[in-house]
Amino acid sequence: MLDAFSKVVEQADRKGNYLSGDEINALSALVADSNKRLDIVNRLTSNASSIVANAYRALVAERPQIFNAGGACFHNRNQAACIRDLGFILRYVTYSVLAGDGSVMDDRCLNGLRETYQALGTPGDAVASGIQKMKDAAIAIANDSKGITKGDCSQLIAELASYFDRAASAVV
């Protein structure tokens, strides 16, 4: 996993160049944006339990057949694994927001996840629905302007949404 700074330096070094004015300006903007990132990550981390629990409850209400007798998530062990996995995905979304890069989520969370769910008989579209529910809650929390560093957060919210979309796409 490389953060944005490391990537820019690596690219310039590969070319044998100093950082360009545009690259320095882009990194300066990233530094200015970092407080907003920290605010959002802090909010999501502080609300992680409720984000995951509410997404799980909504998923059970939406798809009871999966959680009833004979369903892929019927046993307590499977239900606990579902909650755990939603928590893992949320955690890696927060890492991605903090780094400004989703590669850590791809490398350590999403690679092979679809195949795992297929092997377990868990419908990927159900997992994707749970991820969508977390996305909706996370965006609502991140969009609350109280206690967030002043400034336009629309690009950061779009980035946050893209990490959830990436995770949802990885499981179907």
Curated annotation (Swiss-Prot):
Name this polypeptide is given: Phycoerythrocyanin subunit beta
Localization annotation: Cellular thylakoid membrane
Keyword Electron transport: yes
Keyword Metal-binding: no
PTM characteristics: Contains two covalently linked bilin chromophores.
Family: Belongs to the phycobiliprotein family.
Membrane-topology descriptor: Peripheral membrane protein
Gene Ontology biological process terms in this record: photosynthesis
UniProt keyword terms in alphabetical order: Antenna complex, Bile pigment, Chromophore, Electron transport, Membrane, Photosynthesis, Phycobilisome, Thylakoid, Transport
Source species, domain of life: Bacteria
Quaternary structure annotation from Swiss-Prot or TrEMBL: Heterodimer of an alpha and a beta subunit.
Source organism phylogeny: Bacteria, Bacillati, Cyanobacteriota, Cyanophyceae, Nostocales
Binding site for (2R,3E)-phycocyanobilin: 82, 153
GO cellular component, one term: phycobilisome
Function: Light-harvesting photosynthetic bile pigment-protein from the phycobiliprotein complex.
Native source species: Nostoc sp. (strain PCC 7120 / SAG 25.82 / UTEX 2576)
InterPro entries: Globin-like_sf (IPR009050), Phycobilisome_asu/bsu (IPR012128), Phycobilisome_asu/bsu_sf (IPR038719)
